[in-house]
Amino acid sequence: MKRLLVFLMMFCALSTYSLAQNWVGTWATAPQTVVKSFMPYNNCMTNRSVRQVVKVSIGGNVIRLKLSNIYSMQPVEIRSIYIAHAKDSSDIDAKTAQYFKFGNSYKTIIPAGKQIVSDALKFNLRNLERVAITINL
């Protein structure tokens, strides 16, 4: 199934819940259209995983993930997304891996031209920490 995945350039934003009970952005990237040279030869991302290691600014104990598909004309189907503390390069500490849910389900679809936000997830996110976010398509 072909998908124009606005990569993890599916504007990905990580939010933490502050003591003042407001969501605060701790990491984000600007969405952009897909460049053909960044995609697989057949433009198919089905049954693939995309991992991005990011360094957050502030930590927290409850987090959410915001994903965007605003530049695509096709929906993007996601089988699951998990976060874990990053080790060296793209390695993770598997003991810390936790899956995000969307409406209490691990699977979700990001409609074309839309954004979605995960359910809140209890996760020990430390200030200036590197975490790995893995999207299974």
Short names for language-model regions:
Residues 18-137:
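N-terminal secretory targeting modules
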